[in-house]
Design a protein with these regions (language model features):
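Intrinsically disordered, low-complexity, mixed-charge
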Residues: 1-81
Length: 81
Protein backbone atom coordinates (compact mmCIF):
# COMPACT_ATOMS: atom_id res chain seq x y z
CA UNK A 1 0.00 0.00 0.00
CA UNK A 2 1.10 3.53 -0.82
CA UNK A 3 -0.26 6.82 0.49
CA UNK A 4 0.50 10.17 -1.12
CA UNK A 5 -0.44 13.78 -0.46
CA UNK A 6 -0.98 15.99 -3.51
CA UNK A 7 -1.10 19.75 -3.84
CA UNK A 8 -2.42 20.78 -7.23
CA UNK A 9 -2.03 24.37 -8.44
CA UNK A 10 -3.47 26.07 -11.50
CA UNK A 11 -7.03 26.58 -12.69
CA UNK A 12 -8.53 23.85 -10.54
CA UNK A 13 -11.45 25.53 -8.78
CA UNK A 14 -14.87 26.22 -10.23
CA UNK A 15 -14.21 23.88 -13.18
CA UNK A 16 -15.32 20.50 -11.78
CA UNK A 17 -11.80 19.44 -10.85
CA UNK A 18 -12.50 18.27 -7.30
CA UNK A 19 -15.43 16.00 -8.32
CA UNK A 20 -13.24 14.66 -11.16
CA UNK A 21 -10.48 13.74 -8.68
CA UNK A 22 -13.02 12.07 -6.39
CA UNK A 23 -14.54 10.00 -9.21
CA UNK A 24 -11.14 9.00 -10.59
CA UNK A 25 -9.93 7.79 -7.19
CA UNK A 26 -13.20 5.96 -6.51
CA UNK A 27 -13.16 4.26 -9.93
CA UNK A 28 -9.62 3.00 -9.24
CA UNK A 29 -10.58 1.76 -5.76
CA UNK A 30 -8.36 4.29 -3.97
CA UNK A 31 -9.24 5.85 -0.62
CA UNK A 32 -8.53 9.31 0.75
CA UNK A 33 -9.95 12.79 0.39
CA UNK A 34 -9.92 15.84 -1.86
CA UNK A 35 -10.68 19.44 -0.92
CA UNK A 36 -10.30 22.99 -2.14
CA UNK A 37 -7.76 25.25 -0.43
CA UNK A 38 -6.89 28.90 -0.86
CA UNK A 39 -4.03 27.82 -3.17
CA UNK A 40 -5.76 25.16 -5.27
CA UNK A 41 -6.75 21.58 -4.54
CA UNK A 42 -5.30 19.23 -1.94
CA UNK A 43 -5.78 15.48 -1.87
CA UNK A 44 -4.55 12.35 -0.15
CA UNK A 45 -4.82 9.02 -1.92
CA UNK A 46 -4.03 5.53 -0.70
CA UNK A 47 -3.92 2.18 -2.43
CA UNK A 48 -1.69 -0.15 -4.44
CA UNK A 49 1.30 1.58 -6.06
CA UNK A 50 0.20 0.54 -9.56
CA UNK A 51 -3.22 2.13 -9.12
CA UNK A 52 -1.73 5.33 -7.67
CA UNK A 53 0.56 5.60 -10.70
CA UNK A 54 -2.45 5.13 -12.98
CA UNK A 55 -4.33 7.80 -11.00
CA UNK A 56 -1.49 10.31 -11.43
CA UNK A 57 -1.25 9.70 -15.19
CA UNK A 58 -5.01 9.97 -15.69
CA UNK A 59 -5.20 13.05 -13.45
CA UNK A 60 -3.20 15.00 -16.03
CA UNK A 61 -4.49 13.28 -19.17
CA UNK A 62 -8.25 13.30 -18.36
CA UNK A 63 -8.66 16.53 -16.36
CA UNK A 64 -11.71 18.71 -17.07
CA UNK A 65 -11.31 20.75 -20.26
CA UNK A 66 -11.69 24.08 -18.44
CA UNK A 67 -8.97 23.24 -15.92
CA UNK A 68 -5.23 23.81 -16.12
CA UNK A 69 -2.64 22.12 -13.95
CA UNK A 70 0.41 24.30 -13.41
CA UNK A 71 2.08 22.21 -10.72
CA UNK A 72 1.54 19.03 -8.74
CA UNK A 73 3.52 18.56 -5.54
CA UNK A 74 3.67 15.01 -4.18
CA UNK A 75 4.61 13.86 -0.72
CA UNK A 76 4.88 10.22 0.32
CA UNK A 77 3.08 9.47 3.59
CA UNK A 78 3.01 6.44 5.84
CA UNK A 79 0.10 4.18 4.83
CA UNK A 80 -2.82 4.29 7.26
CA UNK A 81 -3.56 0.57 7.00
Amino acid sequence: MVRKALKIRGIVQGVGFRPFVYRLARDLGLTGYVRNTSEGVEAEIEGPARKINTFLKRLVREKPAASRIDRVTLKILRPSA
